[in-house]
């Protein structure tokens, strides 16, 4: 598949020009606007469509166009449980977390980051939880961003023949430009366009493949289908392999309750009306995207036959079905998926460092302008670290990096976010315990028990974090009346 045609190059270069142009536009438009809330949260001005598609696109990394179709192409429909878990998790997050978190964050001293919200929720002057959370953010986002950079490198290497490392450098530089210049507004608007592109690519490709396969001149490739390929129970029955795949797949849904770059989209929505619109759009988008991604994997096996790398099934189908320029546009959807996730992760880690480490610890009297530049510098540093992780041949690949980071966030922050929104007895000490225990159990399980048990580490990490937060809260002094009063009025509509 080595060399891209001129049509594909034109389409990909136009895509790059678009995302850079968005960053430049918002830099020029907002260059006189001061305030960390504007740069890191877009001034809480996002409409329903932009917020919903930005949340979806920043969530669905290149995994949805490479990892999921590839795993279903190779192993069969039994691998669909991750997609089912993600759909359930997305719907639950939009319904049970998004509106309450937005309202509570406004009333909790207008918090603009998740660590800031957790601290303000307890009206605490102790910055320990805020700092611990921000450190976890920066560490895990280095790993998560590496998966997106790796995906860009894989695509460019496959389509153009360019070396993977060179491609990673180019992708990292482009992401840096529009995040550095435009901040949250640029990230959300590029995510909006990228979300639309991903949807179009996943809708068009399998539908056209079906039409081609029904043609009289289509000769189906001969390819053996593995045992249980069309069985939703990957182990062929109700055995531990099937159950662990189902539990682990559904467990991915728990990650949404603690995913900072998705949660911050909820904070940015400008009104109650736009929130309701976002809920409908966000849930519908994720359902269609994941369903069509699975269909690509199933149809790809019948359409393509044997291919060398299963995670390139979407790439092969697009290049075989469409003329060069359209092929380039649709292949840009993979770049869109990777870059929309990376930009959101970089901005979330940037805001966490500036608001939760730089100002509370390093320079307490830092101005808004200075904090913006502190955030921009950390974006560069994290990008460099993420590049070296992605370039390491022993990093484990896109799926391994995503699994690791997703579980880390879900285990550390998922239980605490849910308890902070639904349990007025949660204490500051309980929240600290939940974050620390969830993160440590997740890391230990990943290192020593994940392979032998077949159970995804987010399950034990989330449960242990939840138990730790509840036990420590019950053993510590009850929250003050001021804290419980804030909790009681936090969920009244804001407009």
Describe the residue ranges of each PLM region:
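Membrane-embedded helix-loop-helix hairpins and adjacent transmembrane boundary segments
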Residues: 1-495
């Amino acid at each position: 598949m080595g060399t891209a045609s001129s049509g594909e190059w034109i389409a990909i270069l136009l895509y790059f020009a678009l995302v850079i142009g968005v960053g430049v536009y918002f830099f020029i438009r907002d260059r006189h606007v001061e305030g960390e809330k504007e740069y890191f949260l877009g001034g809480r001005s996002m409409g329903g469509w932009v917020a919903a598609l930005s949340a979806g696109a920043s969530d669905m990394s290149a995994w949805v166009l490479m990892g999921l179709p590839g795993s279903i192409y190779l192993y069969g429909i039994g691998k669909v449980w991750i997609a089912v878990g993600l759909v359930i998790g997305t719907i639950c997050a939009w319904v049970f977390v998004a509106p309450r978190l937005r309202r509570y964050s406004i009333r909790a001293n207008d918090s603009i980051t998740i660590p800031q919200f957790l601290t303000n929720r307890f009206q605490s002057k102790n910055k320990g939880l805020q700092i611990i959370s921000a450190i976890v953010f920066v560490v895990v986002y280095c790993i998560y961003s590496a998966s997106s950079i790796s995906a860009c490198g894989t695509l460019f290497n496959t389509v153009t023949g360019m070396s993977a490392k060179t491609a990673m450098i180019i992708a990292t530089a482009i992401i840096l430009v529009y995040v550095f210049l435009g901040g949250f507004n640029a990230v959300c608007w590029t995510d909006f366009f990228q979300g639309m592109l991903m949807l179009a690519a996943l809708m068009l490709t399998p539908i056209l493949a079906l039409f081609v396969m029904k043609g009289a001149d289509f000769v189906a490739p001969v390819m053996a289908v593995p045992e249980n390929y069309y069985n939703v129970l990957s182990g062929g029955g109700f055995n531990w392999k099937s159950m662990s795949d189902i539990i682990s797949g559904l467990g991915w849904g728990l990650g949404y309750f603690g995913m900072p770059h998705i949660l911050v989209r909820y904070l940015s929505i400008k009104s109650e009306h736009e929130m309701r619109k976002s809920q409908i759009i966000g849930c519908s988008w994720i359902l269609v995207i994941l369903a069509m991604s699975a269909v690509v994997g199933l149809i790809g096996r019948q359409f393509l036959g044997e291919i060398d790398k299963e995670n390139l099934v979407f790439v092969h189908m697009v290049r075989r079905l469409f003329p060069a320029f359209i092929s380039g546009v649709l292949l840009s959807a993979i770049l869109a998926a990777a870059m929309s996730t990376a930009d959101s992760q970089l901005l979330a880690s940037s805001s966490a460092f500036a608001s939760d480490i730089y100002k509370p610890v390093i320079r307490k009297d830092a101005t808004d302008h200075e904090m913006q530049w502190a955030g921009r510098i950390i974006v560069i540093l994290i990008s460099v670290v993420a590049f070296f992780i992605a370039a390491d041949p022993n990093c484990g690949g896109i799926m391994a990096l995503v699994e690791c980071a997703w579980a880390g966030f879900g285990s550390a922050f998922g239980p605490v976010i849910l308890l902070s929104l639904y349990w007025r007895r949660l204490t500051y000490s309980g929240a600290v315990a939940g974050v620390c225990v969830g993160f440590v159990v997740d890391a230990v399980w990943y290192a020593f028990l994940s392979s032998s048990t077949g159970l995804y580490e987010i399950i034990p990490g989330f449960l242990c974090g939840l138990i730790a937060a509840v036990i420590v809260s019950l053993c510590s002094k009850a929250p003050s009346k001021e804290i419980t009063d804030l909790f009681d009025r936090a969920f009244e509509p804001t407009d």
